[in-house]
């Protein structure tokens, strides 16, 4: 049974918060227990505060009119006799992907609010599934798009929401129609983080600070800051820089709204905090950070986490010509950067 927060879906013109679903349940057995989940959109799955996802951007990017993929998780040993907290955070993925009419995603027949279907099983018996016993609330993610970026307001966080049994501010979900596509188990290599890269240089501009991560790559930012409530931080990502900041010409189109070209926004709460986007992905060498002070503009403020499918090498290449070696290195990094499933 598929459930969603509602029928309204996220667009550039009208932002809709990513929904967080929650269910409290008891489990008085230590037998084999599994969770099967699929989503139209993307999901993050949490059990008693721990994230279960095997992969970034789960379950798999697909056209839900044709194929929808599901994942299975073995949760034996992770359950309590009483008050287990199961949470599902949904993002838009490709179901609501804005592309400024380049590939006509805006008019796709499958466009809808993100939704998911889940079964919790003990052995072969389904104990419960996604239904109206799940409750739903807005998450602090106020906008998410796989390419355009993500916007997050830390002041909307619900304290300890992934572990607390409190259901205050949660309401009933909407039971919705299933997708048209065939349901298939996901057997692809997971999308994983490949280290974390610090800036090799930081340069002040008229509007902020440019962080140079040394090479073009794909992935997500990791922001760490001590801030005051309400401080707004804008993160713009690009492959090149111009005279007054990052240059989007290699990654945008004539119709593009530049406020939605690889642009993340983080609204701070009080104190020390960290942020990594959940449902977006950027290709860049440079990040322009706006809204921070000179004291905050340190290398520790922003790092970059390369993210790509977990694909291994089957051979290595090395020769006595350093130019050729460098070209091979760049080519391999470019190949990995373009493999998300």
What are these regions (language model features)?
Residues 1-341:
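Extracellular/oxidizing-compartment recognition motifs
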């Amino acid at each position: 049974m598929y459930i969603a927060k509602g029928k309204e879906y996220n667009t550039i013109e009208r932002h809709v918060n990513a929904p967080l679903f929650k269910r409290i349940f008891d489990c008085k057995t230590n037998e084999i227990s599994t969770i099967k989940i699929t989503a139209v959109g993307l999901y993050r799955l949490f059990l008693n505060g721990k994230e279960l996802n095997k992969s970034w951007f789960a379950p798999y990017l697909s056209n839900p009119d044709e194929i929808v993929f599901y994942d299975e998780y073995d949760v034996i040993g992770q359950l309590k006799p009483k008050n287990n907290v199961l949470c599902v955070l949904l993002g838009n993925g490709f179901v609501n992907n804005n592309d400024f009419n380049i590939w006509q995603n805006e008019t796709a027949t499958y466009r809808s609010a993100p939704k998911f279907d889940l079964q919790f099983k003990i052995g072969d018996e389904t104990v419960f599934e996604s239904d109206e016993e799940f409750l739903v609330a807005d998450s602090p993610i106020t906008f998410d798009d796989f390419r355009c970026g993500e916007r997050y307001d830390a002041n909307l966080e619900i304290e300890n929401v992934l572990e607390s049994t409190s259901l205050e501010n949660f309401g009933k979900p909407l039971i919705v129609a299933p997708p048209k596509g065939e349901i298939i188990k996901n057997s692809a290599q997971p999308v994983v983080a490949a280290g974390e890269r610090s800036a090799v240089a930081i340069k002040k501009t008229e509007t902020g600070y440019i962080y140079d991560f040394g090479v073009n790559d794909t992935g997500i930012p990791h922001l760490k800051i001590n801030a005051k409530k309400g401080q707004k931080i804008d993160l713009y990502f690009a492959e090149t820089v111009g005279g007054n900041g990052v240059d989007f010409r290699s990654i945008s189109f004539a119709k593009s709204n530049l406020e939605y070209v690889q642009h993340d926004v983080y609204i701070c709460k009080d104190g020390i905090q960290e942020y990594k986007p959940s449902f977006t992905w950027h290709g860049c060498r440079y990040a322009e950070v706006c809204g921070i002070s000179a004291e905050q503009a340190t290398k520790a403020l922003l790092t970059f986490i390369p993210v790509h499918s977990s694909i291994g090498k089957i051979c290595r290449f090395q020769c006595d010509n350093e130019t050729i070696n460098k070209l091979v290195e760049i080519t391999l990094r470019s190949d990995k950067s373009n493999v998300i499933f």
